[in-house]
Amino acid sequence: MKDFAAIDFETANGKRTSVCSVGIVIVKGGRIVNKIYRLIRPAPNYYTQWTTAIHGLTYDDTMEADDFPEVWAEIKPLLEGLPLVAHNSPFDEGCLRAVHELYGMTYPNYKFYCTCRTSRKVFGKDLPNHQLHTVAERCGYNLENHHHALADAEACAQIALLIIPDPPKPKKAKKADKDTHVGDLFASLIPQQVKKNK
């Protein structure tokens, strides 16, 4: 895949609305053209020990951060026309839908692709697991700061460039032959059985 935006959310607690950071890597023409990292004030605004142990963020880190709507207003125009790619996309898509609903925002129905699901199809049992760092290593990318949203998004982008094919282009509808009459077109739509019963 050559044109997409890789995305990764980290959350402050077990609620999918509690996104506390987002990393986005925009790829066009097979090249990374933009990287975005933002802290977000989570909702609900509290951290659990186990989430902090995963990504290292605390209440103090996001105390003065913007709420999701302000952050997304900056990001949304950059994603126009691009599919989104995530590793374990049901989680990130679930977070994105949840915060849109929480803040009464219209969800744009982003098209998501999943590098984890694709890895299972491409590599299968050749890998011990299909976690992000494992797949990244298999694709020749060294993920040094796992669970930092931007680092994870960049790893996801590098994987997607290698293993997710470009989506098929929609077929163009054939134009009717210039010599075809309207009556002939309607006749072609009449089921054969109906014609026989006339």
Describe these PLM feature segments:
Residues 1-2, 33, 110, 180, ...:
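Sequence-level motif detector for i,i+2 pairs with an aromatic at +2
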Residues 1-109, 125, 129-147:
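Conserved non-catalytic scaffold segment of RNase H-like nuclease domains
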Residues 11-13, 117, 155:
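Short, glycine/acidic-enriched loop or turn micro-motifs at the edges of active sites
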Residues 94-95, 155-158:
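Amphipathic alpha-helical interaction segments
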Residues 108-119:
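Conserved beta-strand -> loop -> alpha-helix junction used to position metal-binding or nucleic-acid-contacting
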Residues 138, 157-198:
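Acidic two-metal-ion nuclease catalytic site recognized across multiple nuclease folds
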Residues 152:
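Conserved catalytic/binding loops enriched for acidic/polar residues
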